[in-house]
């Protein structure tokens, strides 16, 4: 089932009690308060969950190389940006938390020639498009942030515009089937929870079904050409994360035509 933009907006109003960008400011305030704790907890190499569950398959699907110009979405303290820089890529990394970007610049200062850190709002298409530089991005990546973003449609639309025709977008997010234990799986809704024990403030999570996420990807012009469901430690049959690779539908058509 595919929802129109009006359907999704009405669902947001009914479940979240908000308009198009409401909720973003509250979420931003929370992340401003959590920024220093998050930077300390994630450090230079990220935490065990990211290192073992998220990063391996994200990197496999992204396949970063020295020729790449990569957009790192909701970059946090920039530890994955530096991981990409270590592999020779040039990176533009952004987050909506000014404090987080300050910490990222400080922590990743040795990669200043390869990484440009910016403050931008992932729910604001215009804000993202202002990250356009002299060349198109070859790739885009988002590690465990889709579920923290109030409205992902502007992000998907903007990323599609910023990528070169053969570009790819890889994102990892909570698996909506197994992390959000709810009787209202099909209904978009938000809730408060923590990501790391001890963080100062509970963050806001935005639950979307797989079909809602994928249909927004398709509507933006993407197709899916890579997908993983990843488990953590002893939960070998319960995937906590899904990792998706998107590419332009036009690029796929061109590829099929040339074959």
What are the roles of these predicted feature ranges?
Residues 3-65, 79, 83, 103, 169-196, ...:
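Conserved class I S-adenosyl-L-methionine
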Residues 69-125:
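Class I SAM-dependent methyltransferase SAM/SAH-binding core
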Residues 128-140:
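A short acidic, Gly/Pro-enriched loop at the edge of an enzyme's catalytic core
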Residues 138-152:
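A short SAM/SAH-binding and catalytic strip from SAM-dependent methyltransferases
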Residues 153-168:
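A short glycine-rich, Lys/Arg-flanked "PGG" loop and its adjoining helix->strand segment in the class I
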Residues 173, 196-211:
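Acceptor-substrate binding/catalytic loop of class I
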Residues 204-227:
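Short alpha-helix
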């Amino acid at each position: 089932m595919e929802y129109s933009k009006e359907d999704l907006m009405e669902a947001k109003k009914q479940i979240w009690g908000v308009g198009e960008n409401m909720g973003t400011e509250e979420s931003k305030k929370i992340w401003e308060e959590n920024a220093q704790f998050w930077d300390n907890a994630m450090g230079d190499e990220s935490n065990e969950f990211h290192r073992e569950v998220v990063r391996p398959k994200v990197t496999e699907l992204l396949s970063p190389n020295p020729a790449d110009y990569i957009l790192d979405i909701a970059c946090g303290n920039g530890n994955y940006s530096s991981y990409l820089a270590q592999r020779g890529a040039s990176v533009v990394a952004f987050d909506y938390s000014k404090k987080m970007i300050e910490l990222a610049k400080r922590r990743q200062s040795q990669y200043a020639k390869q990484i440009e850190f910016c403050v931008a709002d992932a729910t604001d298409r215009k804000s993202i498009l202002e990250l356009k530089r002299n060349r198109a991005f070859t790739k885009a990546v988002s590690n465990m942030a889709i579920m923290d973003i109030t409205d992902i449609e502007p992000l998907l639309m903007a990323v599609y515009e910023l990528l070169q025709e053969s570009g790819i977008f890889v994102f990892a997010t909570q698996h909506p089937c197994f992390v959000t234990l709810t009787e209202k799986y099909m209904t978009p809704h938000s809730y408060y929870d923590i990501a790391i024990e001890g963080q100062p403030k509970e963050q806001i999570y935005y639950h979307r079904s797989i079909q809602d996420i994928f249909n927004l990807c398709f509507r933006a012009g993407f197709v899916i050409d890579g997908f993983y469901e990843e488990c953590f430690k002893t939960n070998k049959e319960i995937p906590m994360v899904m990792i998706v690779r998107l590419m332009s539908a036009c690029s796929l058509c061109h590829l099929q035509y040339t074959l």
